[in-house]
Amino acid sequence: MAGARGRVAVIGAGVAGLTAAYRLQRAGVAVELFEADARLGGHAHTQRAVGADGRAVALDTGFLVHNERTYPQLVELFRELGVPTRRSEMSMSVRCHGCGLEYAGARGPAGLLAQPGALLRGRYLRMLAEVPVFHRRARRLLADPAAGEPTLGRFLAAGGFSPFFVSHFMNPVVAAVWSCAPEVAGEYPARYLFAFLANHGMLSVTGSPSWRTVVGGSQVYVERIAERLTAVHRAAPVTAVRRHPDGVTVDTADGRRTEADAVVVATHADQALRLLADPTDAERAVLGAFRYSRNPTVLHRDASRLPRAKGARASWNYELPACDGGAGSVRVSYHLNRLLGLDTAEDYLVTLNEDRHRPVAPEQVLSRTVYEHPIYTPESVAAQRRLPELATGRSAFAGAYHGWGFHEDGCRSGAQAAHALLGGVLGGGANLGGARLDGVHPDGVQLGGVQLGGVQR
């Protein structure tokens, strides 16, 4: 058996797999990390561009920001790795191509009243008045276990909230945070969603944490973990994981077979299920309950994706095709200059699910990527409660789907997977180098007195 404490195969080099591999190796385990892509990091994805002045700039297009209050595992990891961070500006706007409304939060009255005549918009003023009502009723639901488990859509309908509030406030909150289509947002479990909002100070007009971003891009932390690992296999897609009484066997697409004492499967839930050659009934039921949304993403310099009113321009810019929200995908553009503190003449933006009727100017496109994000339903939330059942024997699972789908959730689940194996099949108890397994769930954005959520994973 290689290594003083055994040998573990870790499948997937996103934040969950990287954290698990790092924690296990620090505890004296021989680790082999397998990643299907040639690039490590998953949603920690830093791309490079050259500005008009000839300077190269690092641009994150996946995971962007974190905070000390709700990302304790990630903050601890960054501290250990010596990853430099800086403050980020967090604000969010909504732009409706139907009625022409543009407003932004966390930018004071200038953001909420960014357009001349905003105070003459009756539906908009009613929406602003409905926000504190929503906050109170959401807190009331959380405080009452007997209130049932309504979906967000049913909660809003029962509360008599206006269609304008739903389409111009509530849907942007959920859709921007979880990168889901507006019609999917209404199916989210209300209690689960409100617990997230409450944990991030987003069910009141104050209390949002201070946000930070990694200096030089999130790839900095990925590289610092990778250089500490002894066996990293890039462009090595795993085709099957077989478990047997004496260990596990990992097969890769190039025909290679790796033997290990245990395995951490740190992929999306549906991918993990496909990799298992012998899934148990519990694994089929739990992992099979998760669905994912595919979000085509464009990195570009087309500033027309921002609101026309300069006072409404924000870090997160949500677009509505029509007042009813319209069917289809979430459309949001992240203004990297604000989020990453870029000192450049050019505007750099990341747009999710660009509108084919209002496409990004082709000459301004720098790259295209597709990211997947978990979709939360009553079924997947119920399955999530059963995930600890799967961390038995010689296999453990990790991924952001273990929490709210964000970077902290992936980091925490990776540490927990390492902890489970060290305290189980690898024996000798767990020693994770001081890492804590406490903390609360992930991200959110505050809109000043009007709060909207949204933090890219």
Where are these predicted regions, by residue range?
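Conserved flavin/dinucleotide-binding core of flavoenzymes
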Residues: R48, A104-R107, G325-G439, D443, ...
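Extreme N-terminal leader/targeting segments of oxidoreductases
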Residues: M1-V8, R26-A27, A49, T377-A383
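N-terminal glycine-rich dinucleotide-binding loop that anchors FAD/FMN and/or NAD(P) in oxidoreductases
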Residues: Q47-L74
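Helical element adjacent to the flavin cofactor pocket in flavoenzyme catalytic cores
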Residues: A195-A253, T258
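Mid-domain catalytic core of redox enzymes
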Residues: A4, A27, P237-E372
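N-terminal Rossmann-like FAD-binding beta1-loop-alpha1 element of flavoenzymes
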Residues: G6-L33
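Mobile amphipathic helical/loop "lid" adjacent to a hydrophobic cofactor/ligand pocket
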Residues: E68-A195
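Glycine-rich FAD pyrophosphate-binding loop
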Residues: Q25-V50
